[in-house]
Each structure stands twice: as structure tokens, then as C-alpha cells.
């Protein structure tokens, strides 16, 4: 099962924050008192969003919430999103709730894993079909045109279904304004030693300019590797320049209204469907799209 820790000072603590984390960061008697408050209030096994926890009228629960907010959410969120937790959708901050349990797993899915031969091979196999034609290095706007009452594909009226998964604002040349996204710069480093950090992912929630370090051999379970490779992730604001990738939609009310302008430009075409992170301006995990 996938587990993630956060580097907070000299400690590596499990995230999402759970009862194990609670006992690591508070002294024994205090931790036991706070654990009882959490289980009595929310029930063992519950998942409580940090912004909900901060609204509690109980001083002890607010003390936990303040610790989690300051040491796990605040700086990490500002790095990742360029905004404070209060400024983005609670759908985003709620993705990493406080767990009222002793489960250190980052995900709760019964089955977890990666494709045996990697995602590259998996998608090659998916696309290797006689009914699938792949066209590379082609802007959708070059082959897809919107007329008043129909869609043209390669200059001809097209009555079939069109499923669009790209950035919807760029499909319309950002005519209503560019939808804000966060992008990432991946800095790869290789070391001639068996291990760099002894685990797959370490989040840096109170320090560093990067958000996390991933050490791949702990995800792939490779044993016969020559050294170890890591990657550091540096978030930045997407501008649309060549080479930048719009990874994360910045979900708030203002951006949602802008997205709706673009969505309404497509709703007249009954055979046109928006699907995925970019086209729907949403934050999906890969399992939600299968």
C-alpha cells in the first residue's frame, strides 16, 4: 500500500494526518485526551476535512486543526497552488482529510498498484487497435472547426461523437481569458547509492521550494537498479508557453465562472463532449476516469 510522510522539522510524520501522527507530535497524555475527543466527536474511521476541523467549537480539536493547518497544509498549499487553503475550493483541501484511524495508507482502496510494465506500455497496448488512428503533433483546431450548427472534421460535416479532452479555453483561443492552472517543473537527480530517502514519497510541508521528493524504486519495487533516481517537484503558474503543461486546475468560484463561459460555447453541439481534467476543469485521480 502506498504511504506518504511529511518532513516537519526533524520528524517524518504520516500523511494524511491520523491517530498515529497525533501520538507522534503530541506528548502521551495530551495525545490520548485529543484522540478521545476526535473519536467521540467524529467516530473512529471517519475522514474529516481540515477546514471543517478548524470550525470546531472544542478547543482541543481546534488545537489539532491548528497543528495540521500550520504544519501540513498552509505552506504546502501555497507552494502547490499559489494560494492559501482558504482561497481554493474545499474539494481540493478535502482530498487529504484528517483520518480518525491508525491507517497510514495514503489511499484507502483495497487494491493498489501500478501496471506491471509501466503506464507507457499500458497505453501503447490500449491504443494498438485497428479502429484507432493516432495523429501526432497536430493542434485540434487545425482539424476541428465549429460552425453555427455543426462540427467540421477535416473540413467536412461530422455527425459522429467528438470527445474532447484538451484545454477547453485553448480550443477557443482563450477568447474569454485564460483559465488558471498550476504547472510543475520536474528536477531529476541520480545517486550512486542504494537509497536516497528510504521510501517512495516525502512531502516537504514547512520547508523547501519543492513540494515533494519521489524515489521511484520504491514504487516499481526494482531490486537490480544501478543507484537510485529521484525527482523534486517545483510548482509554478501555467502561462501557456511552449513546454509548459497545465497539470492542476485552480478551483475557486471565479475560475469556475470563467470555465462555464467556455462550456456554454460547446453545449449547442449535441455530439460534442468535454471529458477529463482539462476539458472539465476538474481535479481527477486516474482511477476516477476508468
Map each language-model feature to its residues:
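A short alpha-helix-loop-beta-strand transition element characteristic
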Residues: 1-9
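A residue-level signal for conserved active-site and pocket-lining positions in enzyme catalytic cores
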Residues: 77, 126, 163, 213, ...
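Active-site/ligand-binding neighborhood in enzyme catalytic cores
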Residues: 4, 21-160
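Conserved beta-strand termini and adjacent loop/short-helix elements that scaffold enzyme active sites
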Residues: 135-139, 216, 275
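Mid-domain catalytic core of redox enzymes
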Residues: 141-265
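Short FAD-binding loop at a beta-strand-to-alpha-helix junction that anchors the flavin cofactor
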Residues: 266-282
Amino acid at each position: 500500500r502506498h504511504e506518504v510522510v511529511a518532513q516537519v522539522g526533524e520528524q517524518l510524520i504520516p500523511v494524511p494526518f491520523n491517530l498515529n501522527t497525533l501520538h507522534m507530535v503530541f506528548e502521551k497524555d495530551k495525545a490520548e485526551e485529543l484522540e478521545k475527543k476526535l473519536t467521540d466527536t467524529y467516530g473512529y474511521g471517519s475522514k474529516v476535512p481540515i477546514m471543517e476541523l478548524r470550525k470546531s467549537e472544542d478547543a482541543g480539536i481546534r488545537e489539532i486543526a491548528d497543528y495540521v493547518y500550520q504544519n501540513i497544509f498552509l505552506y504546502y498549499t501555497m507552494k502547490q497552488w499559489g494560494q492559501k487553503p482558504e482561497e481554493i475550493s474545499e474539494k481540493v483541501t478535502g482530498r487529504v482529510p484528517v483520518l480518525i484511524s491508525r491507517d497510514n495508507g495514503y489511499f484507502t482502496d483495497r487494491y493498489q498498484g501500478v501496471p506491471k510494465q509501466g503506464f507507457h506500455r499500458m497505453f501503447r497496448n490500449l491504443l494498438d487497435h485497428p479502429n484507432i488512428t493516432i495523429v501526432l503533433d497536430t493542434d485540434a483546431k487545425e482539424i476541428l472547426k465549429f460552425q453555427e450548427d455543426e462540427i467540421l472534421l477535416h473540413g467536412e460535416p461530422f455527425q459522429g461523437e467528438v470527445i474532447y479532452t484538451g484545454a477547453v479555453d485553448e480550443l477557443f483561443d482563450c477568447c474569454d481569458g485564460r483559465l488558471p492552472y498550476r504547472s510543475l517543473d520536474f528536477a531529476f537527480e541520480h545517486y550512486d547509492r542504494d537509497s536516497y530517502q528510504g521510501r517512495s514519497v516525502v512531502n516537504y510541508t514547512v520547508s523547501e521550494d519543492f513540494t515533494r521528493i519521489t524515489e521511484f524504486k520504491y514504487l516499481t519495487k526494482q531490486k537490480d537498479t544501478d543507484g537510485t533516481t529521484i525527482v523534486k517537484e517545483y510548482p509554478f503558474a501555467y502561462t501557456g508557453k511552449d513546454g509548459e503543461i497545465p497539470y492542476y486546475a485552480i478551483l475557486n468560484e471565479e475560475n469556475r465562472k470563467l470555465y462555464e463561459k467556455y462550456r456554454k460555447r460547446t453545449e449547442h453541439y449535441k455530439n460534442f463532449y468535454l471529458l477529463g481534467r482539462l476539458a472539465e476543469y476538474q481535479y481527477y485521480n486516474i482511477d476516477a476516469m476508468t
